[in-house]
Amino acid sequence: MTEPRMMRLGVFLSGSGGNMASWRHPSAVPDGAVNLKYFQGLTRKAEDAKLDFVFFGDGLYISEKSHPNFLVRFEPLTLLAALAMDTTNIGLAATLSTTYSDPYTVARQFSSVDHLSNGRAGWNIVTSPLEGSAANYNKPEHPQHDLRYRMAGEFVEITKGLWDSWEDDAFVRDKESGVFIDPEKLHRLDHKGEFFNVQGPLNISRSKQGSPVLIQAGSSEAGRGFASKVADAIFTGQATRADATAFYKDVKQRATSAGRNPSEVLILPGCGPIVGDTPEEAEAKYQEIANLVVIDDALNYLGRYFNDMDFSPYDLDAPFPELGDFGRNGWESTTDKIKQLAKDENLSLREMALRSTTPRNEFIGTPAQVANSMQAWFENGAADGFMLNNSVLPQGFNDFVD
């Protein structure tokens, strides 16, 4: 008998919340991004609420215009190791770049976290959209978008091979016979590829999962192709159910074409629920968040998608400027959507900046309204679950869970 399909839920824990001005909210913890006790409390709450996982993003470049939660934050795998000691069942996932890391180190790091957490680690595989990252890693320039995905494909192939360095029962550890390992169950990788040469084997035994859950976040053509071949779960950001349904269908078909079972490739759109006892209360909470955003911060937030572009010289109330292909080497799918939305709705620069900073979605309302919207996406081919990304933490998450 087929088991019933279950909605999967994770929560993106990003300091004071996803909104650029969230740290100013009365309920916010302004230093949340570097406050271990704060993250421990939120993670325990997520575990008690039976969520599947918590997630921590990362980036490798900042400027004075960056999101406050990005200006100062923990290195995420270190944080996962700490949270593993404080939780029992919930999955622990984090971002790590394939463009500015090496496969052997990444394989060790995630295998270690998987051991420490007793098989609860997840890796959000990114290729690093921020072009300024290159200068922090002794690189002359940021690789082109499609090249980064080619590198990522080989990178993940290597890490998966390294995680299979040892068979499950390779470590005998027999004191009487003096046999520590069975050498027949040790496998050296000897990978020689386009971008990497890695000998192996990995110097840690197979973890409980064998490998972490592999996650990918990207909606570009290259991102979809990559995710459909390697990801167990895909984070995506479609704003409407129609767009989410089209994405869902496309990626499931790609997974099938890649020889995979599409039901094992989970599509998890972002969901920013704002919950109130009445629709009016929920709307008031949205407006309270939106009113915290000043236009300069909104322009900075928008600019980060366009390689930290300075929009201040432009007329705020003129139509959104024509930018051509600018931004596509970083956030390709996101910048394409911004440009298309501005064109379709004839938005001014001011309107586009404010909308991008505090987007309105289908998940604002009473508990029943939000639950019904999520169920509609889940039951109609738009989602296998959701990544909760609350505008303000901890209030937004508490409202949703409670």
PLM segments and residue spans:
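Hydrophobic faces of well-ordered beta-strands that scaffold small-molecule active sites
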Residues: M7-V11, V54-F56, I90-L96, G119-I125, ...
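Alpha-helix-loop-beta-strand connector modules within alpha/beta enzyme cores
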Residues: H67-A93, M151, T256-A258, F397-D402
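An alpha-helical appendage that flanks or caps ligand/catalytic pockets
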Residues: T2-G17, D146-Q209, A242-K249, Q253-F378
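N-terminal beta1-alpha1-beta2 module of alpha/beta enzyme domains
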Residues: M1-T87, Q209-P212
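Hydrophobic or amphipathic alpha-helical targeting/insertion segments
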Residues: D86, G91-Y137, P143-D146, M151-F155
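Conserved, mostly hydrophobic/aromatic
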Residues: L9, A46, K50, L83, ...
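Active-site mouth loops of central-metabolism enzymes
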Residues: A21-K37, T95-Y104, P140-H142, D146, ...
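Short, acidic/polar
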Residues: G32-A46, V106, Q216-F226, E288, ...
